[in-house]
């Protein structure tokens, strides 16, 4: 009775702020799974805290409460003899909060879909494409892989509001990851760059540009014989300076987060994941606490 590695979707704030996306935490992203397996994931995250705002916008003391539900599908693939995966995630969120705008208190409520996210990943070293029967004898050592995620510029968005659920821009996130197993322990490291398109209809009709956000993430995972696994995570990110109508903002981000994940098998097809994270050191950008849960159902030939 095991929970397949790397198949539970990442759950992050479905807001337009770039740093919330860059702070996403996902242990076991680079691991092996039998070819042809399908995964359906439904999840919920509650997050509360500050939000990313441009230095040129007089918004201070911001605090948001965000309830996010996520539906995702993933499938493991054979990519030229190496294991891979494709997944798609669609978030829906409800947010409410308050802040001070030009010294006056303001409030905001919104709900709607966030932009869908598509990702393809491939393991280059240490994770060959295997059938369910072959996978029974597989033992992980060192895995090296990469992924490419794309976010679509759709979802709820109102240019007359500073805070929205959709982002009204594309993003592309290439990532490189390494995973080393020794006994029940696995150490994982990954580095990524989140590259943003321009929002040509930002608040007040302005054009908003944002520099890439670079991140470094580490996980220490312990796997129990029962199929339960637990992970501690630390992530650091920097970059993301914004430009509004050609004017550079003084909002370089340089922050870190810590988190924990617990994955529990229910039976051969069903599993549950519990998750929590918090800001550790925040210079500029999104500072929030989050807790969540996800349910996964898997099916495929040989299961």
Functional labels for PLM-detected ranges:
Residues 40-46, 86-94, 144-152, 189-195, ...:
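Transmembrane beta-barrel strands of outer-membrane/channel proteins
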Residues 36, 63-71, 111-118, 142, ...:
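Residues that define the transmembrane beta-barrel architecture of outer-membrane proteins
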Residues 42-44, 71-75, 118-124, 148, ...:
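Residues on the lipid-exposed face of transmembrane beta-strands in outer-membrane beta-barrel proteins
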Residues 21-41, 126-140, 300-303:
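Outer-membrane beta-barrel biogenesis signature
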Residues 25, 203-303:
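Outer membrane beta-barrel transmembrane domains
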Residues 94-209, 250-251:
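Outer-membrane pore/translocation modules
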Residues 47-68, 105-106, 159-166:
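Surface-exposed strand-loop-strand hairpins of Gram-negative outer-membrane beta-barrel proteins
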């Amino acid at each position: 009775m095991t929970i397949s590695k790397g198949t539970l979707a990442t759950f992050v704030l479905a807001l337009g702020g770039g740093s919330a996306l860059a702070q996403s935490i996902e242990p076991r992203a680079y691991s092996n799974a039998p070819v042809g397996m399908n995964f359906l994931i439904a999840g919920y995250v509650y997050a509360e805290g500050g939000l990313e705002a441009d230095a040129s916008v007089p918004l201070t003391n911001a605090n948001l409460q965000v309830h996010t539900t996520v539906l995702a599908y993933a499938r493991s693939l054979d990519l030229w003899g190496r294991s891979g995966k494709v997944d798609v995630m669609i978030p829906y969120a409800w947010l409410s909060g308050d802040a001070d705008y030009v010294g006056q208190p303001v409030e905001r409520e919104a709900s709607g879909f966030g932009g869908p996210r598509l990702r393809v990943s491939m393991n280059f070293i240490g994770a060959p494409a295997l059938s369910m029967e072959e996978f029974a004898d597989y033992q992980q050592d060192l895995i090296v892989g990469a992924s490419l995620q794309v976010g679509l510029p759709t979802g709820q968005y109102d240019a007359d509001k500073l805070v929205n659920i959709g982002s009204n821009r594309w993003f592309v996130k290439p990532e490189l990851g390494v995973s080393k197993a020794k006994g029940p322990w696995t150490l994982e490291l990954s580095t990524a760059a989140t590259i943003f398109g321009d929002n040509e209809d930002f608040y007040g009709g302005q054009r908003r540009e944002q520099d890439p956000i670079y991140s470094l993430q580490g996980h220490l995972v312990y796997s129990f014989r029962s199929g339960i696994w637990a992970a501690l995570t630390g992530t650091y990110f920097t970059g993301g300076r914004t430009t509004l109508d050609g004017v550079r903002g003084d909002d370089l981000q340089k922050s870190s987060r810590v988190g924990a994940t617990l994955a529990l098998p229910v039976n051969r097809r069903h599993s549950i994941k519990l998750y929590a994270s918090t800001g550790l050191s925040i210079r500029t950008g999104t500072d929030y606490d989050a807790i969540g849960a996800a349910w996964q159902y898997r099916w495929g030939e040989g299961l």
